[in-house]
Amino acid sequence: MCRQRSRINWFQNGDRNTSFFHAKASTRHKKNFMDSLVDDDGVWKIEEDKMEEIAIGYFGDLFSTSNPIDFSNLLLAVQPKVTQEMNEWLVWPFVACEVTEALKQMYPLKAPGPDGMPPLFFQHFWSTCGAVVTKMVLDFLNFGISPCNFNETHITLVPKIKEPKKITDYRPNSLCNVVYKIASKAIANGLKKILPSIISDTQSAFVHGRLITDNVLVAFETMHHISQ
């Protein structure tokens, strides 16, 4: 856990000097720890309940709307691109090897969620816990059976700048249980096979081999050509 918290590449720096990594982890924790916030009136708040009110108020307004729009008419104009063959592929039951493959593709030391375990734990002890985890994931994917707390998350606030003061200087990040991430990864792997066929050629994200910077380069070249 100390290695995970320190965010240091152990393969390059070794793992013998534990005091060094403890100091790194402590420094990082102190830098990211939220001990105060500035409210909308510019007043510093150090009480935990006051900071909680600021966070709930800000993100509550951010992720809600006072003018909801009905998208049903808009969706009627969207032409379906998923063929019958694609649909048969998507609804085909998941199998155990897809669960194992999804776990192998996960970064070992991602921050843990409510389960308290990084993917490395499951990867290392798969011979022991693999059967139980596989059954849990397949029951969810194929039959919609989810155990209690399956999709619970821990929401942590990550600083967007070096010295955050306001709640706007933080972005929320959801930390999910590993089993839940395995299920979502398995679904994503299945979608990869049909995404190139249903996503526009002008969409430069989500499809393997396309870069989000491609559209930026196209826009730059277009403006350069117009200005000539």
Region locations from a protein language model:
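Short coil/turn segments at secondary-structure boundaries
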Residues: 23, 49-50, 74, 168-170, ...
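Cytochrome P450 catalytic core segment centered on helix I
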Residues: 51-53, 61-76, 80-84
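Short, conserved non-catalytic motifs in the polymerase core
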Residues: 33-47, 84-90, 99-121, 153-179, ...
